[in-house]
Amino acid sequence: EEIVPGPKSRYRIKVEGKKHTLIIEGATKADSAEYSVMTTGGQSSAKLSVDLRPLKITTPLTDQTVKLGKEVCLKCEISENVPGKWTKNGLPVQEGERLKVVHKGRIHKLVIANALIEDEGEYVFTPDAITVPLVCQIHVIDPPKIILDGLEADNTVTVIAGSKLRLEIPVTGEPPPKAIWSRADKAIMEGSGRIRAESYPDSSTLVIDVAERDDSGVYNINLKNEAGEAHASIKLRLWISLILRLAPNVTEVGDDWCIMNWEPPVYDGGSPILGYFIERKKKQSSRWMRLNFDLCKETTFEPKKMIEGVAYEVRIFAVNAIGISKPSMPSKPFVPLAVTSPPTLLAVDSVTDSSVTMKWRPPDQIGAAGLSGYVLEYCFEGSTSAKQSNENGEAANDLPAEDWSLQTQTGSTRPKFTITGLPTDAKIFVRVKAINAAGASETKYYSQPILVKEIIEPPKIRIPRHLKQTYIRRVGEAVNLVIPFQGKPRPELTWKKDGAEIDKNQINIRNSETDTIIFIRKAERSHSGKYDLEVKVDKYVENASIDIQIVDRPGPPQAVTIEDVWGENVALTWTPPKDDGNAAITGYTIQKADKKSMEWFAVIEHYHRTNATITELVIGN
């Protein structure tokens, strides 16, 4: 590319006698190239390489310590306007709602709007043109907090005389704060004394091995870290315990409730029992939840609002004027479970002279206890008086249990059952219940008595729509036709082809209670014809026909004759093929070939006549 100096060009040419100089103002990386100068007497070339100006760090990154939730701004400045990349602990920084990266000229910023503990770490900014990165540390701190949610009113703790107190107070803060317990301005040391403190990363614990009367009073806890301090006072109250010796007993369980009872304390602590508090928890959890805020005056209680299918435990506390007892032992684990809703859509599927088949749909609501099976019962009409009941939305029969005969037990969830061994012309009532681990559902009754007598249902053949016209298949293809039908008792079926019996060695016929199948593995033209089906039940007869046509490729046209040749045209005639492939001829294809090459090309396709004129031939060929 020729360099043309000009007023607005960065290129200038300086001539001093025989010396010519090319001057590039404001050279950039893009100016790196090979430059040539040519004269009438020769040529000279030189390669130019433009490197970036060495960068200098004007303002380095500085380590920062910031409180939790405050904004962090990491800022650095370099001598040139070049981009760069931020990393945290060796990984690229991902921008988001809280974290923004700003590159403005030579100044580069990383802004964290709301500092979290996980934002702590080593941050590095690496400019694209410098090998030495800029490094700083972010240290997030959080003032300590004391969590007293689990204490009684006025931050009071009651301990039973002679028992061990382990008062665990959750604490938070970053870095983890140092905890100091004290009483009456006297520090409680960590160690092995009867009264001692224990420190953990997320809690601080006051331990009294054997509580004594003089241990009552106010205990102070002080937390301190580099972000701040926190203080709290806890009142310790000592009393003689009520003694609950036995765990409560759960006597009945529902879908989200249970009934529990218990024995009064064997010792009332010298003061009459005022009532009881009840707690429950999930078996896999350690968190107990108080169920009553008003004292329960009785020794029985009904917890509610539990989750079906989840194991629970319950325990109780006795209360007198002095205070609250230790908790009782937890009850044995129990699981709230509900019976299913009743089965639905109970209906008669079929009836014979000695059996009745009933079918139904599973319950709409099954629940956590699942579905174990069904109980189906029947009784004969006239066993007892019947009355109307709307409990299930249908007429139901209120019959004594001894009149009902059990037919199926749990273990099968198939919603269908056949009652066998019934006397002909008897009438029976039927009912069904769903069973699961919680017991039996409400009963679903069939709305009316069922007559034990086979009902003749006249036959009916249901020819599929695609078989109502001629069914066409090619030679060698499979034929598989399914013809549904109805009729009771099981109909007698007869197939004929063109009025004659079907050769079962060539055509397979398969019959079931509801359909018949014609199957031909490899169709031949001899399989074409009219197939007649007769379905007979008692004196009732139903007939239907199917036309099957097995087709093949046609034979060649006959008597191809050149009638006339003129110019570049030729007139042809022919007769249809002797073998039409068992289907109407739909057209002809005419091809031509040069005698020298004998390569055939289609001239006319899908032609319906038996004569044609071919044009545009080459004269002399």
Swiss-Prot record:
Origin superkingdom: Eukaryota
Keywords assigned by UniProt, alphabetized: Actin-binding, Cell adhesion, Immunoglobulin domain, Muscle protein, Phosphoprotein, Repeat, Thick filament
Chain ranges passing through the membrane: none
Record-linked CDD domains: FN3, Ig_C5_MyBP-C
Keyword check for Repeat: yes
GO molecular function, a single term: myosin binding
GO BP, sorted A to Z: cardiac muscle tissue development; cell adhesion; muscle contraction; sarcomere organization
Keyword Magnesium (UniProt): no
Pfam families (UniProt xref): fn3, I-set
Positions carrying Phosphotyrosine: Y445
Occurrences of domain Fibronectin type-III (ranges): 244-343, 344-459, 556-621
SMART domains: FN3, IG
Family: Belongs to the immunoglobulin superfamily. MyBP family.
Assembly and interaction partners: Interacts with USP25 (isoform USP25m only); the interaction prevents proteasomal degradation of MYBPC1.
Protein name: Myosin-binding protein C, slow-type
Annotated source species: Rattus norvegicus (Rat)
Name of the gene: Mybpc1
